[in-house]
């Protein structure tokens, strides 16, 4: 059921993709649906180039036949389609539970439009309700960064995979910081990034142009207020 909702929302996002566009390709389960559906359109004749936000997305895009390009060749992306782990009423986001938060943020900020595709369980009203804030950290600075996050409140756990520290595509560690409800996402995002050794966080404030949410009652399209 949930997987079907994600697929429906991904198909709805394809309406924004036009011939000749440069498209940012997100990471995660919902983005996977979008990449596969975009691949079907490409095979049918749609001409686009994709910029993936992770090695995982790059491999899938190649598999389904989407031509790829880079930010070096195209500094401006027409539209990026990605998922999110939480979406607030103001369309701020927590992302990065898939581990690609830094590249996702780079691509998002290079995009004219960012469409976030989710199922209804991700609409949480406020951020920090269900998900931790992923924080990407240079390995040398791990304990300093963890200590600072704990001082601010909550618990910060090193993400692991198969008994070893999880490594991002950039070769960094990720701390999952259970902060609790977030009142000012933009301020906290800036505060976290100000810690030496922290690369960035999974708070995406003022980034999403539109959120497409698949619900049991149908597709909801939410626009950021101007």
Label the predicted regions.
Residues 1-79, 92:
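N-terminal glycine-/serine-/threonine-rich phosphate-binding loop
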Residues 4-7, 55-226:
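Conserved phosphate- and dinucleotide-binding cores of soluble alpha/beta proteins
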């Amino acid at each position: 059921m949930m997987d079907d909702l994600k697929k429906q929302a991904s198909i709805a996002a394809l309406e924004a993709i036009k011939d000749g566009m440069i498209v940012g390709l997100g990471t995660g389960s919902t983005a996977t649906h979008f990449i596969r559906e975009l691949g079907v359109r490409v095979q049918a004749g749609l001409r686009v180039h994709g910029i993936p936000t992770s090695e995982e997305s790059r491999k899938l895009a190649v598999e389904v036949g989407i031509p790829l390009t880079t930010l070096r060749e195209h500094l401006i992306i027409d539209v990026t389609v990605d998922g999110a782990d939480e979406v607030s009423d103001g369309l701020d986001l927590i992302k990065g539970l898939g581990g690609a938060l830094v590249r996702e943020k780079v691509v998002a900020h290079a995009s004219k439009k960012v469409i976030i595709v989710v199922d209804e369980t991700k609409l949480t009203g406020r951020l920090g309700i269900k998900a931790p804030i992923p924080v990407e950290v240079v390995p040398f600075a791990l304990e300093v960064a963890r200590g600072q996050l704990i001082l601010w409140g909550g618990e910060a756990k090193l993400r692991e995979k198969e008994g070893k520290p999880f490594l991002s595509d950039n070769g960094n560690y990720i701390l999952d910081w259970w902060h609790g409800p977030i009142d000012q996402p933009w301020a906290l995002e800036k505060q976290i990034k100000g810690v030496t050794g922290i690369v960035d966080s999974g708070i995406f404030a003022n980034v999403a142009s539109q959120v497409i949410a698949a619900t049991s009652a149908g597709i909801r399209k939410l626009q950021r207020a101007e």
